[in-house]
Amino acid sequence: MGPDPAWPPVLVAEDLLGAGVVAAFTGRVGGSSAPPFATLNLGLAVGDDLRRVLANRRRVATVLGLAGHPWALARQVHGATILRVGTGRPGAGRPAAGRPQADTVGREVGTAAARGPWVEAGGLGQGPPEGKAPLGEADGLVSSEAGVVLAVLTADCAPVLLADPEAGVIGAVHAGWRGLAAGVVEGGVAAMAALGADPAAVVGLVGPAVGGCCYEVGADVREAVGDRYPAALATTRDGRPALDPAAGAVQALERAGVGQVRVAGECTVDLAGRHFSHRRDHGRTGRQAGLIALVPSGTGGGR
């Protein structure tokens, strides 16, 4: 199956982050995967053909002008752990400040080295050696090194991309209801601050996620998130209790002092032609991504 030309493979956030940052949210169209992963599936752990997934990733990287740069992905567990990511190369990017520090939810900000073009946590799919290098379990990544692509994979949860362009610090957060309730978004901002970012100078981008129109939840889930983020409380079209993860992420960013927040405003369940949705497709589906990288000014071909 050849690449699907019907839609651009990425939604690029333009003119928000300056020339030194590339950020994008991918959709489901523009790749080479077959149903039920058609077509731009970027997840290795869903049962898709490995060669097609890697081809899809390479296509996205090429469009963004990031071909050959290492991708950093953690094993996402719907928690609040944040990892600091670097290439391990002496002198790469801006120097990192200090030792690992505690984030706002009391977990240590770990350190991991990204080796190879597709860095995955251990156990995420079967692939070549570069597909097995572990970053560990985490739902947020931060970095101050140029050339490292931070990536979070989603299929209903909210992908949150963060950047302080002046300080040269970026972050990517996977925010589902459990992560929201645990404070993963604020943890990502705090981890960036530990690397020298100013929350007031941070730009936050919240990508496509399941909307309150379609995300019916039980009373326990609604309470766990709604008690912390009332903005996340919603009602489905037929009047049932629901949550809006993107709205919760926005409120979390605002509480963390993030200076500018933009929201994609697209529901992954509603827009079946544009996005993968675990809920809509009963778990048999692909993964889209939120991607962000620091790059030298003037690079980043997709901008």
Regions picked out by a protein language model, each given a short descriptive name:
Residues 1-303:
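Active-site microenvironment for binding and transforming phosphate-containing groups
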